[in-house]
Amino acid sequence: MSSVYKTKNLQGHERPIKQLKFSSNGKYIFSASADRKVIKWDYKNNTKDFIYQHQASVNVICISNSDRYMFSGDSTGCIYVWDIDSNENIKKIQFEKLYNITSLNISSDDIYLIVTCSERGQKSNNFIAIYLVEDIIKKTPKEETKEKPANLLQIPSMMNQSIKSEPAPEIYKKIECSERNTKFIKSCFTNMNKSILISRQDGFLEMYDFTNDKLIFSGKFHNDEILDFDVNYENGIIISSSKDGEMCVINLNSFQLINRFKPTNPVRLLNSCRIGIIDNPYYLIPGTKRGISIDTLFDLNTLDLNKLVFFENEKDREKAKKFKNKRQIILAIVAGGQDSKFVTTTEQKEGGFEIIIYNVFSGEKLAEFLDHFGPINTLAIHDNVLASGGEDSSVKVHDINHYLFDK
């Protein structure tokens, strides 16, 4: 069950990584950083494909499901729109006021862009703005710019090109936070774009009916700010991670709590979480042979895995028992660490900088590994490939199969 690689290290940023995203086809990883850059990585070949330049720290990015457009938001409230194939900057949108953009997401049909933002210094002016993507990407005439020489790395980039900003298009729909002493942190579409899932600063998760403009559900799952969440529609689950050091697994339909994890003690910030669906290489298919035909000897629904003789060695037999003959394994992956302002005097093992992988439903810890020298700020996953970005400015690419099956 050996994997091709354990971990790849992608070096190209000078400041902390803020967010990572895979392209829908899994070909590229996009990394947004406080160094004002987004890098498009051809990670399979360990190369930079393109560098996109902002004029401030890039905090959030999202990729259209068609893999045609990238949207990136920075600390000055600017949203840049990029054509991924040509790497052309289509538009730079500047809000009228100085907004802090905390999340960018796109609907599964690529029709709506959902932006979570708050006005700097204003507790009450916090809202979610939903735009029509066709209004966002609409091209406008540009002034001609002289071609500049390539940067020293000889990587194509937008570094030296000046981009004229434009006012934001008309908001299609706006959701304002009704509670005065909290803020929206993140939002995304769910349920075939009929609903919007929202996380709040006070530990609440909310579901908003996008079609009928009403709140469906509001419930408190954490004792502090929810820093991240992820949704898996096929299995009907949400996972959320928080400043309170806990990760919750929640039923998407009933909003009942399924599991609660507290990975570290003392409490560390859980900055990012992702759901992973991994094929089980130890799954025994009815009618196939691993030494003998199993379907004639066992009812697979009540298979006694302690009596297995189909695997070559004891290690494989133990793995087969561990994963209980499930065709797929559903994972909850979480990472974070000690607050970055305290990190300079912290030992790597004491900071809670590990990536931890759990079985969503059983709650069993399946793997734990340490690969960053500081807090992990963001996770992204595509199939069995997990990417992590840290305060140490590095992007790591991990083969999950190695940590689950090769150890």
Task: Place the predicted regions along the sequence by residue.
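A short helix->beta-strand "capping" segment at the edge of beta-propeller domains
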Residues: 1-14, 45, 167-172, 362-363
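WD40/WD-repeat beta-propeller blade N-cap
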Residues: 10-17, 52-58, 94-101, 176-184, ...
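Residue-level detector of Asp-centered blade-edge/turn motifs that repeat once per structural unit
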Residues: 24-25, 65-66, 108-109, 191-192, ...
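Hydrophobic beta-strand positions that form the internal "hydrophobic ladder"
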Residues: 29, 70, 113, 196, ...
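Conserved strand-to-loop turn within each blade of WD40 beta-propeller repeats
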Residues: 32-35, 73-76, 116-124, 199-202, ...
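WD40 beta-propeller blade core
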Residues: 39, 80, 129, 206, ...
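Short loop/turn segments that connect beta-strands within beta-propeller blades
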Residues: 43-46, 84-87, 133-136, 210-213, ...
